[in-house]
């Protein structure tokens, strides 16, 4: 086998186009976008991106709304913690 790309990774398809800093930003997004994530329902590492913001678990067939490029966003984590805190305050 021929030696594969070391630095550019998935953005090797762009060649020398678009500039190195833009390709670096795109690489970060595309690696997150194509990765598999842990399913919060069945616990398996089987969640893949179906479309922008739609994430599907291939194991339990659940569909979850998330970020466009990542399964969970920082804003979603903030909302979850706020809801949990408000629920605990209401119960107490």
From Swiss-Prot:
InterPro entries membership: Ribosomal_eL37/eL43 (IPR011331), Ribosomal_eL43 (IPR002674), Ribosomal_protein_eL43 (IPR050522), Ribosomal_zn-bd (IPR011332)
Presence of keyword Zinc-finger: yes
Gene Ontology cellular-component annotations: cytosolic large ribosomal subunit
Gene Ontology terms for molecular function: structural constituent of ribosome; zinc ion binding
GO BP, sorted A to Z: translation
Keywords, in A-Z order: Metal-binding, Ribonucleoprotein, Ribosomal protein, Zinc, Zinc-finger
Protein name per UniProt: Large ribosomal subunit protein eL43
UniProt similarity note: Belongs to the eukaryotic ribosomal protein eL43 family.
HAMAP family from the UniProt entry: Ribosomal_eL43 (MF_00327)
Zinc finger (C4-type): 39-60
Signal peptide: none
Organism annotation: Eremothecium gossypii (strain ATCC 10895 / CBS 109.51 / FGSC 9923 / NRRL Y-1056)
């Amino acid at each position: 086998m021929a030696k594969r790309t070391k630095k550019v990774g998935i953005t090797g398809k762009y060649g020398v186009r678009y500039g190195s800093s833009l390709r670096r930003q795109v690489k970060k997004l595309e690696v997150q976008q194509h990765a598999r994530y842990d399913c919060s329902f069945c616990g398996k590492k089987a969640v893949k991106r179906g479309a922008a913001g739609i994430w599907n678990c291939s194991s339990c067939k659940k569909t979850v709304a998330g970020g466009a490029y990542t399964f969970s966003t920082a804003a979603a984590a903030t909302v979850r913690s706020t809801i949990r805190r408000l629920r605990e305050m209401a119960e107490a």
